[in-house]
Amino acid sequence: KVGFLAPTLQTEFMIGIDEKLHEECDNRGWDYVSASFDNDSAAAVSAIENMVTGNCNYIVAMVSDTSCDDALRAAQEKGVKIIECGVETAVHDLVLKTDQYSIGTQIGDMAADWLNSQLGGEGNIVVYTTYQNQDMQDRGQGIQDAIKEKAPNVNILEVVDIGKDVVGSGTTTTETMLQKYSNLNGIVCYGDAAAVESVEAVKAAGKDNENFGVFACDGTNQALKGINDGTCMRGTMYFEALGSVVAKYIQELVDGKTFDAAIETPIHAVTKANIADYYKADK
């Protein structure tokens, strides 16, 4: 039995992982349960304990820090295999991770390339990040550093903490930014959920034109559709289907394989130039 512990199950990215992992487990005849801790460490600990009492053999934990280590260690001591996804702490049997700062620089590189080609290396942007966990803070810093390096004449007008997976924050923040900065040319977000909301706010303000760009990360279907349809959504980082990737490695654990080193999960930059490789209109 597999348990999936997610920071939220309200965003398209996390819902997609949950649904795909559930499907993969069903295909293998494994029982499956998922829970969201809504970025609350106490809720995460409770969910882990419930998965142990619910006879989970494997827990896929997308924790954001070390606050769950004791609960994960207690689960491990009862024979549960721990798969950490995204963040590496001291307690795990397998880690699937990404270099969050590197992801940030890749998002920033996409934005800088567009700013250089479309606006001659000039322009005014805002960056949406969050300081609620170290990973997203690192990603946000990578965004800023890459833009400063590759498009040094672009003005980063403001770096905004929009919270972690807060539904609606992209909309309200973008409405504020558009009112505050009439000369805004772009928004660079740590994740697609806020970016997709931002695109809609930009459209509503009548600024969805060739000189406005939104960039983010996750490769959600909504973000890919925005790129494909020619909106101001210009680029996203695409994670290969994480549900399938996780299931593949759980199968290897089932088969007795052990892992000494973390596994880097594959990720790809997607823009208008290669959108056809990642998005099909009938999805």
What are the residue ranges of the model-derived segments?
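A residue-level marker of the well-folded mature domains of exported/periplasmic proteins
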Residues: 1-283
